[in-house]
Amino acid sequence: MSRLGIMVLTLLLLVYMATSHQDAGEKQATQRDAINFRWKRSLTRRTATEECEESCEEEEKTCCGEXDGEPVCARFCLG
């Protein structure tokens, strides 16, 4: 094989390695973002649940969730 052929193959190999490394970085970043989103969402839910429980506790009722951002309090929760 000539020098030119070897240089072309080497260049193609380097380009392939560089692009596959970039793709792996994008995939890793996407997975990290998904994990962070789930973590933030669970913190928000926990805070909302605690607020609902505190609000209903004042009325001596049970927190059944939220509707339109407001806590739903009742003696017994159905469903």
From Swiss-Prot:
Disulfide bonds: 52-64, 56-73, 63-77
N-terminal signal peptide: 1-20
Domain of life: Eukaryota
Cellular location(s): Secreted
Keywords: Amidation, Cleavage on pair of basic residues, Disulfide bond, Knottin, Neurotoxin, Secreted, Signal, Toxin
One Gene Ontology molecular-function label: toxin activity
Tissue expression remark: Expressed by the venom duct.
Residues recorded with modification Leucine amide: 78
Alphabetized Pfam families for the sequence: Conotoxin (PF02950)
Record propeptide residues: 21-44
GO cellular component, one term: extracellular region
Domain notes from UniProt: The presence of a 'disulfide through disulfide knot' structurally defines this protein as a knottin. The cysteine framework is VI/VII (C-C-CC-C-C).
Family: Belongs to the conotoxin O3 superfamily.
Name this protein carries in UniProt: Conotoxin ArMSGL-0124
Organism: Conus arenatus
